[in-house]
């Protein structure tokens, strides 16, 4: 189980800021460490709810229509890393701790928010950006859904119509 994994020298080197308090520099280290563990980022598919992960957790999927950046506070900000953090945390909580999707999602969302705010961006502005695109993405006609996408979030949300569309899109790709 992941939570019993011993610390390695590499893991120790990822900690550049030593603080047990809420600290933006620690969150920057966390963001880099999590992203370094993701084996593949895929932006070639249609992914309802903006982003998701493969069943084995090795890939993070971001919808092909989701912009890679947003204008936040007047600055262009790359946003994929926040989505990757969210999805990686959510998947780890589902697989390693066996949490229900809604609980895993809440913790992942709060982690995403902490990362956004640690970089000095307003959560309200970032969240408005993601929600606006989530509505567009959810309304799209699904054509390219990966066959290894973990469907747990869609099953737990009881979004059966979306599940049917996804399964049909997967079958049409085969």
Where are these regions (language model features)?
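Active-site recognition of the HExxH zinc-binding catalytic motif
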Residues: 82-94
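Metalloprotease/metallohydrolase-associated module, dominated by Zn2+-dependent proteases
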Residues: 12-79, 95-174
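Residue-level marker of positions within ordered structural domains that often coincide
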Residues: 1, 89, 113
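Low-complexity, glycine/serine/proline-rich disordered segments
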Residues: 1-15
């Amino acid at each position: 189980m992941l939570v019993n994994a011993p610390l390695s020298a590499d893991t120790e080197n990822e900690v550049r800021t030593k603080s047990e308090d809420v600290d933006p520099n620690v969150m920057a280290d966390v963001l880099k460490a999590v992203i370094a563990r993701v084996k593949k980022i895929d932006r070639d598919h249609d992914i309802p709810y903006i982003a998701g992960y493969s069943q084995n957790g090795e890939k993070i999927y971001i919808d092909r229509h989701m912009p890679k950046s947003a204008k936040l506070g007047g600055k262009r900000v790359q946003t994929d890393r926040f989505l990757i953090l969210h999805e990686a945390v959510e998947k780890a909580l589902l697989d390693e701790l066996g949490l229900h999707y809604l609980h895993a999602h809440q913790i992942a969302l709060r982690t995403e928010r902490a990362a956004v705010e640690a970089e000095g961006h307003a959560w309200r502005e970032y969240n408005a950006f993601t929600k606006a695109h989530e509505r567009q993405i959810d309304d799209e006609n699904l054509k390219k859904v990966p066959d290894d996408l973990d469907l747990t979030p869609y099953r737990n949300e009881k979004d059966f119509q979306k599940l049917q569309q996804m399964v049909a899109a997967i079958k049409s790709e085969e």
